[in-house]
Amino acid sequence: MSYSYAEKKRIRKEFGVLPHILDVPYLLSIQTESYKKFLTVDAAKGRLHSGLEIVLKQSFPVESKNGQYELHYVDYQIGEPTFDETECQVRGATYDAPLNVKLRLVVYNKDALPNEKIVEDIREEYVYMGDIPLMTTNGTFIINGTERVVVSQLHRSPGAFFSKDDSEEGAFSARIIPYRGSWLDFEFDSKGIIWARIDRKRKFCATVILKALGYTQEQILENFSESKTITFNSKGFALRLDNLSNMKGELLKFDIVDAQDNVIVKKNKKLTSRDVKKIKDAGVDSVAIDFDLVSTLRVAKDIVNEATGEVIAYANDDVTESLLKSCVEVGMLELEVIDFITTERGRYISDTLKYDLTRNTDEALVEIYKVLRPGDPPAAASVKALFEGLFFIESRYSLSDIGRMKLNARLGSDKVSKDIYTLENSDIVGVIEELINIRDGKGKVDDIDHLGNRRVRSVGEMVENQFRIGLYRVEKGIRESMSLVHKDKLMPKDIVNSKPITAAIKEFFTSGALSQFMDQDNPLSEVTHKRRISALGPGGLSRDRAGFEVRDVHATHYGRLCPIETPEGPNIGLINSLASYARVNDYGFLEAPYRKVVDGKVTDEIEYLSAIDEDNYVIAQASTKLDENNHFVEDIIQCRSGGEAIFTESSRVQYMDVSAKQMVSAAAALIPFLEHDDANRVLMGANMQRQAVPTLKSEKPLVGTGMEKIVARDSGNCIIARNVGEVAEVDSNRIVIKVDTEKSQTSNLVDIYSLTKFKRSNKNTCINQRPIVNVGDKVEAGDILADGFATDFGELSLGHNLMVAFMPWNGYNFEDSILLSERIVKDDKYTSIHIEEFTCVARDTKLGPEEITADIPNVSESSLAKLDESGIVHIGANVEAGDILVAKITPKAEQQLTPEERLLRAIFNEKASNVVDSSLRMPSGTSGTVINVQVFENDKGGKSKRALKIEKELIDKARKDFDEEFAVIESVVKSSIEQEVVGAKIQKAKGLKKGAILTKEFLATLPLSKWLEISFEDEKLEEKVQNAREYYEEAKIAIDAKFEAKKKSITQSNELSPGVLKTVKVFVAIKKRIQPGDKMAGRHGNKGVVSRVLPVEDMPYMEDGTPVDVCLNPLGIPSRMNIGQILEAHLGLASYGLGKKIEKTLEKTRKAAELRKTLEEVYNSVGDKKVNLEALNDEEILTLCDNLKGGVPIATPVFDGAKEEDIKSLLKIGGFATNGQMKLFDGRTGKPFDRHVTVGYMYMLKLDHLVDDKMHARSTGSYSLVTQQPLGGKAQFGGQRFGEMEVWALQAYGAAYTLREMLTVKSDDIAGRSKMYKNIVDGKLTMNVDVPESFNVLRNEVRALGIDMDFDYSSEEE
């Protein structure tokens, strides 16, 4: 096995017995693939079914009302974005590109005859159709400078669905759901009548729809019911027994007798195949029935007197005595009736027709019109147009390819072509037929929670729908413009207004429910947010109406949606996460991968199955035992089939799971020993990992699952090598790789990677990249070159490994509290940097412009000390709460001054009397260091000194960066050709003769540009130098072009909002150490709050003097049932012990041979998966050992982790007791504790619930206008509410004076509180109480009801 650059530095020992079959697919593909499909930029690759292409093709051509103009779509192009991703974030712009559509305007001769079209002119041009947001490489969008994610939606798939309402007997219903257009419902009531609804409006008889489709009453009956023939004569009535085989399984309502009156089949018996044979053998072709039975029947077809043409009875009329007489009179002795005798099937439609008062198609169309447009007078043309527009015109109604496929599959017919997206008559007839079958018990209702009936709508599809909405509005505008614009040479751009498209897309990205502010606490929260699948949003469910069933875990979730990761609270089960290996197919259905089983042998062939396909197969678990030939070891194995867990013969198995972790999401797959935890706690563990704050120093988990490197790689926070090569240069800002062109598919000689430094994330955490390679290191494509935030050697590192003791300590771990050692604070283990952004905006007001200036009235010099001459804080300044960040003045209205004030003003020349200080100040409770300032100004007033200074610094930095980049390219080109050309014969060179040998000394005197002008006799060498020359010149041009583009973007004017003159952004870095009140958690849902930070000397310690880092309450485990944390602690202790063993070996010797022996014991003595140490050279072995001193990292994959025996064996090798317990001593007394304590290493996280963000105190502040009570909440700088329950508590204690103080002067007694303040100032300790303002509010509200209530000031004595 080969190891990557980062893996060689620190190999993770892997447990788990299952073979590695399939790599976890790229975690962000659900976002990137979907948008790529929507935005096929490369026309050469074909845009046949790409999103934009298909929408444009469906919307065009557009024809003018008079038929003179036709606008056709030809092609589209997407331009280059104005700014790159970083620039957009800085400027608060949207990362988008212009969409230019090539349109062809065909002009016809207006004088030509109506039916013939003579083309007069064709005009083509590209028309700007708005800006389309582009997706960044990490699957996000930058909208107005903030990074956003569009969450995928799980919604009901288009198609036909059948359901049952349990509240009513026989209440079955069918619904045809299109991709866009009107919904059509059919439903049974308790009487067996079939009703229809369009768009959930008023119901009407289902047969009205059929008549509107053109069916007659006779045809409707023929389609939905069997008919039987009755003969009658003087002896009575007889029923012909035609199609006996169709009667199988039906209940007989009469005896069947033969010619000798022997009963062959008795009444009230279900007819069997044997009975049918008996009847045929006896030659019985008809059976006598009585009039009572005949009178329940109805006529199947119109009965017409052939002689006169008179209609005796219509189809569906009841068979009555008078009807029979009329038939006899005209010589008709047989009658075709609807078969209610042998089956009830025909009665539903027959009864419905009885309720249906319409007689023909026109009446049916009018009835539908009245339902949909009540109050509108029905005109013949509009009635027909309305009905056709509902289901039969593709621009208004579309099932889409998904809906057509589902509808055909559900009705079990392929009569309708897959390319027809509107409804056909056979679809509607088929749905009603299936509904009748279900009512008769011959079909099954659908499970709407089955993932075969729910599909994922990803970002590309949602933007496509928004684009379609915008384009529909544009289309209407084009039609109007064609008839209004009168121009000699009309061009496409004269009649196209693209604003509706821009508006529709902007609305979706800025205010759509599924376009969300990216969760950017750490790399895992980013990845999880992009893989989230929500059932909420437009066209989805609402959390208030969603029941238990839709939220519950369904059997089809297996391998598709994670059964664990979902929010707690009202959204539980409605927001899910994609499982590790799941993917979305072309139809939007979720698929899971399986290994194919052929003739009892498990192959490595992978097939993805959707939930619909999976129902038909028997699937074995990933942990099923196989022999060396991949055959099943056991004859009876546990499998899944049709959503049930079953035991079955191994010969029946058709597929097998790919991996044990395929059923859980990426976040759940990061939890070691997940299989030993209760699901509720795992849910908390998975959710809390997303809230972990990245710390100053990242540390890998000693006990991981092997998923850490996959999440870190796919999150896009690490820098990954694009090509094979050697590290040429490294510093904190960039990494330069000299590319090995022979092993890489690129002509670039150099790859330069710029690192992100101290950038603010969406959650105010700090994004910073650190290189992990050194100059001279050889790297392969895909190797990690630099760690991002919360990653360590390319592995996700959300927290730190701490030595944990499960023991109580003086009540400081009561109720999940956590006792921490001071060492953790000293070592900055959980110190995190948070970057806050403060914005100051200078606007143009009615009274004049606001001004950002250092000249502020009534502010001391010391307050302005940290500002520059422009009134903006210096970079590097340490700012405290209340310090001015940006000094700003706002004009105020002129006041009438007294003569004395005017005199004083004149004497002291005070000009700033008519302005008020509106500076941006540091909020309370925060302090930090200013790390960056950005100034944005509009062009009108010219640029300020600070803005010009920042601009100059940015241009200088860019010039320096590009110069250095070019210098690197020069040195790489030099070194690549120097070895080849030294000693070669010259063809032509300035200063040397032809045929001379080129020396190193001669080259040293020339610049590289002159080197490349030398020509050589050797053709191959000449070609190589020619290639280097071309590359060098191209690189020079490219770098100059890049610099000019960068310079242009830096100096380009800023588009500020209307009325805004200047915007200043100040970024302050705040360092937060861990302290009591901060929330911490493990990965098993074991969360708690830090109760105390204890000096190291007081912490319990081991026999060798090592103090523990954390004391956790052992009572927090039994009731929570998250035993995984105990196993993690044991395995973590073993890992620590192995690290100590390696450290001791290193202290004795640094010989590679000795170290290899120790590593062999550590890595390969326990567990099935071995580490190939032979793949590492001696130097790599030494580096590996140095990196393992703190502990050997271990991977224990979920559902395939380390067993108890493995942990015990490792503890033994590490030099610890196999029960993981040890004697601890009290740090304060030095005495041992009574019993041995479980001690181990656990990975603990600091969560983004920091006490600094929550603690808040107020003495004075703002009041509510109406009640005059202090505001509430930290954001409003509010007070502490003294609510009803607190008042009752004081009442219960009889604390009258305290209560009076709380309800009056400390709250809303305006006069009282002012007097109280005055008394305190004067040193008087008395309290004057007046009426609280809230009483006045109550009094006024009561007065509004017409009741005069007032306060009685008189005392009882009076």
Curated annotation (Swiss-Prot):
Gene3D superfamilies: 2.40.50.100, 2.40.50.150, 3.90.1100.10, DNA-directed RNA polymerase, beta subunit, external 1 domain, DNA-directed RNA polymerase, subunit 2, domain 6, RNA polymerase alpha subunit dimerisation domain, RNA polymerase Rpb2, domain 2. GO terms for cellular component: DNA-directed RNA polymerase complex. Its EC number is 2.7.7.6. The keyword Ribosomal protein does not apply. Coiled coil: none annotated. Transmembrane segments: none annotated. It catalyses: RNA(n) + a ribonucleoside 5'-triphosphate = RNA(n+1) + diphosphate. The keyword Transcription applies. It is an enzyme of class 2 (transferase). HAMAP family: RNApol_bact_RpoB. DNA-dependent RNA polymerase catalyzes the transcription of DNA into RNA using the four ribonucleoside triphosphates as substrates. The RNAP catalytic core consists of 2 alpha, 1 beta, 1 beta' and 1 omega subunit. When a sigma factor is associated with the core the holoenzyme is formed, which can initiate transcription. This is DNA-directed RNA polymerase subunit beta.
